[in-house]
From Swiss-Prot:
Keyword Metal-binding part of the UniProt annotation: no
SUPFAM superfamilies linked to this entry: OmpH-like
Family that this chain belongs to: Belongs to the Skp family.
GO molecular function: unfolded protein binding
The protein's name in its UniProt record: Skp-like protein
Record bears the keyword Signal: yes
Organism: Chlamydia muridarum (strain MoPn / Nigg)
InterPro entries membership: Chaperone_Skp, Skp_dom_sf
Highest rank taxon of the organism: Bacteria
Matches recorded under SMART domains: OmpH
UniProt signal peptide: 1-19
Cellular component, GO, one term: cytosol
Keywords: Signal
Length: 173
C-alpha cells in the first residue's frame, strides 16, 4: 500500500512538472492599434477618407442646387412672378434633382460600405500573416484579439511586434 501511495505521489508530481514545462503561451494583439498605427492601416484609411471627401463634394454640389431651388419654391413673391409653366418646370426640376440626390446618396453609402469591408479584409489578412510570424518567432501557441481576453499579463501584448512586421511588409511592397 505504501508503495502504491508513493508511486501515485511521484506520478502526480512528475505530471505537474511536465504540465508546467509544457505550458502553452498565449499573446494578444490590439487590432484597433494595428489599424490606426501601421503604415498599411494609415494608407488604407487615407484612401478611404479621400473617397469619402470626393463623394461629399459631389453630393454637396447637389445639396446646394436643391437648397437654391427649394428657396425659390418657398419664396411666394418669386413664384408669383413666374408663369405657370415656369413654376411647374421649377417644381419638376426640384423633384428630379431630389430623386437623383437620394439615389446618389444611397449609392454613395453602398460604395463606402463595400470599400470599407474590402479595406478591413485586406488589413485583417495582413494582421493575420504578421501575427503568425510573431507567434512563431516568440514560440507562442496562440495570438488572440485583445477584445476577447478578459485578463492577461501586459507582457503578453504583441501588438508592437505585429505592427513592426506590417510596416516592414508594407515598405517592401
Amino acid at each position: 500500500m505504501k508503495k502504491f501511495l508513493l508511486l501515485s505521489l511521484m506520478s502526480l508530481a512528475s505530471s505537474t512538472v511536465f504540465a508546467a514545462s509544457s505550458t502553452n503561451t498565449i499573446g494578444i494583439v490590439n487590432l484597433r492599434r494595428c489599424l490606426e498605427e501601421s503604415e498599411l492601416g494609415k494608407k488604407e484609411s487615407a484612401e478611404f477618407e479621400k473617397m469619402k471627401n470626393q463623394f461629399s463634394n459631389s453630393i454637396g454640389k447637389m445639396e446646394e442646387e436643391l437648397s437654391s431651388i427649394y428657396s425659390k419654391l418657398q419664396d411666394d413673391d418669386y413664384m408669383e412672378g413666374l408663369s405657370e409653366s415656369a413654376a411647374a418646370e421649377l417644381r419638376k426640376k426640384f423633384e428630379e434633382l431630389s430623386s437623383e440626390y437620394n439615389t446618389a446618396q444611397g449609392q454613395y453609402y453602398q460604395i463606402l460600405n463595400q470599400n470599407n469591408l474590402k479595406r478591413m479584409q485586406k488589413i485583417m489578412e495582413a494582421v493575420k500573416k504578421a501575427s503568425e510570424v510573431v507567434r512563431i518567432q516568440e514560440g507562442l501557441s496562440a495570438l488572440l484579439n485583445e477584445d476577447i481576453v478578459l485578463a492577461i499579463d501586459t507582457s503578453s501584448d504583441k501588438t508592437d511586434a505585429v505592427i513592426k512586421i506590417l510596416d516592414d511588409s508594407f515598405q517592401n511592397n
